[in-house]
Amino acid sequence: MQQQEKGLKRGLSARHIRFMALGSAIGTGLFYGSASAIQMAGPAVLLAYLIGGAAVFMVMRALGEMAVHNPVAGSFGQYASTYLGPMAGFILGWTYAFEMIIVCLADVTAFGIYMGFWFPDVARWVWVLGIVFLIGGLNLCNVKVFGEMEFWLSLLKVGAIVAMILGGFGIMLFGIHSAGDTQASGLSNLWAHGGFMPNGIGGLIASFAVVMFAFGGIEIIGITAGEAKDPQRVIPKAINAVPLRILLFYVLTLFVLMAIYPWPQIGSQGSPFVQIFSNLGIGSAATILNIVVISAAVSAINSDIFGAGRMMYGLAQQGQAPKGFAQLSKHGVPWMTVVVMGAALLGGVVLNYLIPENVFLLIASIATFATVWVWLMILFTQVAMRRSMTQEQVAELKFPVPFWPYAPAAAIVFMLFVFGVLGYFPDTQAALLVGAVWIVLLVVAYLLWVKPAAGQAAKVHYDPALSHR
């Protein structure tokens, strides 16, 4: 812990952390991926966001219990090492970094698509390349610069979503509808096109692959514990605000969108938010919303690079990543991890140059696997921590999980169910395969390199003289 105080700078305030949690959770999954989820489930996608949101809140409370009890950078990777063993910590830490890289690939891809709204003739990879260099540079600055940027970008998103919800209600009241469309905007759109659950329970279940992707990154609150000024006060406040945010930013937003515009006409060419307002003939709103979804993508990329970098820093401190990852700049930023993330994102530039348009669902479903795996490990770690504690220690917890042990158990069952969803539907089976290969590679890497290295380190530190005392 002492080493931690000398290393990363505690430069993030309550304001920064609250908005970072928002920034990481409101991004490409909502502004772009929601179109795929709507096509799968129809208006019933609202139920999917409510159910998924409840499970995510339990993950956040489990993480919050551990982060308040022991705030460290690289948080849940280190917690897993402590309570489930070093291999579990290694797998969790690297899978989180993998999750952030894949989510980032989705975000930079979406950024290129959004820019195509204004510049349809410019190749998408050009925009992707530019944003990778810009965000990478910003993340090399002082952590406070990062926090400030995240605050203002998130504030813009929140303001725009609130304005869009109010505007949507206005459209419903005054009955504006798109050119050539005889169906006026209104609540009837939620059941007039095949009913509330047009694709049946199967469509609702299929949508979880994209819905859970939308929540990915919200666990960054735990990562910030090592750089929060007052973690025991700040983190509970940030986590307890999660349910309200899910209701407002996902459920209410999509409710308004599907009420003002027939859901079968919501396509995946660009953001559905921009498309709907453009088709309703409100061009200025479409332009403003495109600025907002671009800022949302930038904000999410920003959070992802921060989170993965801090996790790799924590792994390096435990000897589970190259030592260079623990090197700090004069600003107290783990610069090598930022460079590695930037290099990985250049792979996104290549992908956007080479691959077809329908790759977003594949990237999103791979990210869903990594995200849900991380959440499952967080839940298991919290259960292991509780089992290792005495009744007195449990009574002293400052931010305990509610409805223990039933709520965490229900969340664990739900996460396993999402893996089943990925494996069942043909469009997402590749994600389960990629995820399984990734986990196997990590187990092999741990057994071949990390474990022997840890054993060597233990031998070096062993002093025979001590054993004769």
Swiss-Prot record:
InterPro entries cross-referenced by the UniProt entry: AA-permease/SLC12A_dom (IPR004841), Amino_acid_permease_CS (IPR004840)
Pfam families from the UniProt entry: AA_permease (PF00324)
Gene3D superfamilies noted in UniProt: Amino acid/polyamine transporter I (1.20.1740.10)
Main location: membrane
Keywords in alphabetical order: Amino-acid transport, Cell inner membrane, Cell membrane, Membrane, Symport, Transmembrane, Transmembrane helix, Transport
Ranges that cross the membrane: 19-39, 40-60, 100-120, 126-146, 156-176, 201-221, 246-266, 281-301, 335-355, 360-380, 403-423, 430-450
GO BP terms: amino acid transport
Record GO cellular component, one term: plasma membrane
Outcome of gene disruption: The mutant grows normally on urocanate but shows delayed growth on histidine. The deletion mutant grows normally on minimal medium with glucose and ammonia and on minimal medium with proline as a sole carbon and nitrogen source, but not when histidine is the sole source of carbon and nitrogen. The deletion mutant is not compromised in its ability to colonize sugar beet seedlings.
Reaction(s) the record says it catalyses: L-histidine(out) + n H(+)(out) = L-histidine(in) + n H(+)(in)
Recorded superkingdom: Bacteria
Factors inducing expression: By histidine. In the plant environment, low levels of transcriptional activity are detected in the phyllosphere, rhizosphere and in plant extract, suggesting that histidine is present and available in this environment and can be used as a source of carbon and/or nitrogen by the bacteria.
UniProt-annotated location(s): Cell inner membrane
Molecular functions per Gene Ontology: symporter activity
Keyword Acyltransferase among record annotations: no
Record carries keyword Transmembrane helix: yes
PANTHER family from the UniProt entry: AROMATIC AMINO ACID TRANSPORT PROTEIN AROP, GABA PERMEASE
Family as reported in the entry's similarity comment: Belongs to the amino acid-polyamine-organocation (APC) superfamily. Amino acid transporter (AAT) (TC 2.A.3.1) family.
Name recorded for this polypeptide: L-histidine transporter HutT
Lineage of producing organism: Bacteria, Pseudomonadati, Pseudomonadota, Gammaproteobacteria, Pseudomonadales
